[in-house]
A protein has these predicted regions:
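Collagenous Gly-X-Y triple-helix signature in extracellular proteins
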Residues: 1-190
């Protein structure tokens, strides 16, 4: 008989697949999975969505892409403020200077089905090869599977962004609709 257990320990380094628990300022506890090692740190993505849903933009446009979106500003303001000062001090900024961001379509699926093509350097995160890791609960006590945003605007559309549907498949949604988010952050190497 095999028994699968969970061990809790203090660590300085992480490996892909490790899961950490984070308590947010509003009392919500979330889990984040290590998904990719980079030179300056380990990228983590929330296992499930935050309990609240958000639109990508308040107006029906995807002009400017993720970089110009209302949700990007909210992630690095109001939502970042939910994270503890201790965790924020451990975070390394992404290339654009943000401490929180959304995953991209290629990081989740390994290719761009609906979004504009990403760099050849962007690879699918190893845990996302399993469909179950692409699926996310809604972050509430009801534990419904949730649609969530990705950082890619849909190619040839003026008002859609790529999303992941409840079944863990690539899809898209109108930017003014509210769906889940799985923030991604990077913890510095020690």
């Amino acid at each position: 008989m095999k028994v699968k257990g969970m061990i809790e320990s203090d660590v300085d380094t992480f490996k892909v697949g490790d899961v950490i628990e984070v308590k947010l300022a509003d009392g919500v506890k979330v889990q984040a999975m290590a998904v990719q090692q980079e030179e300056d740190g380990m990228i983590f993505c929330l296992v499930d969505c935050l309990p609240s849903e958000h639109p990508m933009n308040s107006t029906s446009t995807n002009e400017g892409g993720y970089e110009e979106s209302s949700l990007r500003k909210k992630l690095n303001g109001e939502i970042l403020n939910l994270f503890s000062a201790e965790l924020k001090a451990m975070m390394a900024p992404f290339n654009n200077g943000d401490l929180l961001r959304l995953p991209t379509e290629k990081e989740i699926f390994g290719q761009n089905y609906y979004g504009e093509c990403e760099s050849l350097c962007v690879k699918q995160w190893k845990p996302m090869k399993k469909r179950r890791n692409r699926m996310a609960f809604d972050g509430t006590k009801y534990e419904n599977f949730q649609w969530y945003w990705l950082a890619n605007k849909v190619e040839d559309s003026a008002f859609r962004f790529v999303s992941v549907n409840a079944g863990g498949n690539a899809d898209y949604y109108n930017v003014t609709n509210s769906i889940g988010i799985r923030p991604t952050f990077k913890i510095k190497n020690h």
